[in-house]
Amino acid sequence: EVTLLIAAYNEQEVVAEKMANCRALDYPAGKLRVTWITDGSTDRTVELLAAYPEVTVLHDPRRGGKTAALNRALGIVRTPLVVFTDANTMLNPEAVAQVVRCFEDPAVGCVAGEKRVAGTGNTGAAATEGVYWKYESKLKELDHRLYSAVGAAGELFAVRRELWQTLREDTLLDDFVCSMLIAAQGYRIAYCKEAYALESPSADMGE
């Protein structure tokens, strides 16, 4: 069994799209547990999620930040593998299956998926962001071929739950730190380009 963990703060605008995306994932029925952690949310995110009986919602009205929410969720989740994704990013249908396949290698403790930027044009912030993530993905792929990728992006990555280490609540790059803590335990970070998360581009260079 696998948990798909979605950390969300006031994401009511994307709940329907994200849940349609979750339901489109090509993974055996009953083997994927979709869990949202919505700590601190004050909009209709929790209310809207109530319409999806297959979803587990973890909610605390107190807002402690994303890192605190992830720490709390990992204290509750019990599946051997946990796949992390953001509420505003959409996964390709094969993403979870491809990520899970990487864990067939017992030396792999973390899997980094690929981040793609949707609808990037030839100019402006969208184009620049798209080029950056293509470059970042290529570096991860090359590192993986040599031995182990370095770091993972929060839009799509996965870990063996038993290797998770509680993060300091002032951690800024939780995805990177989490993956590197697993690498420090002697495990490899695999890169899986067949699993990708699609995200809308930033509106401007400031974002």
Where are these regions (language model features)?
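Glycine-rich, basic loop-to-helix element that forms the pyrophosphate-binding segment
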Residues: 60-77, 134, 151, 177
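Short aromatic/hydrophobic "clamp" motif used to bind/position activated sugar donors
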Residues: 82
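Catalytic donor/gating beta->alpha subdomain of glycosyltransferases that bind UDP-sugars
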Residues: 103-135, 169-174, 178-207
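Acidic donor-binding/catalytic loop of UDP-sugar-dependent glycosyltransferases
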Residues: 44, 87-102
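A conserved acidic beta->alpha catalytic loop
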Residues: 21, 37-46, 62-64, 89
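Acidic helix N-cap motif at the loop->helix transition within catalytic regions
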Residues: 13-17, 41-51, 94
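Short, acidic, metal-binding catalytic loop of nucleotide-sugar glycosyltransferases
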Residues: 20-31
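Cell-envelope/extracellular polymer assembly enzymes that use nucleotide-activated donors
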Residues: 2-3, 33, 177
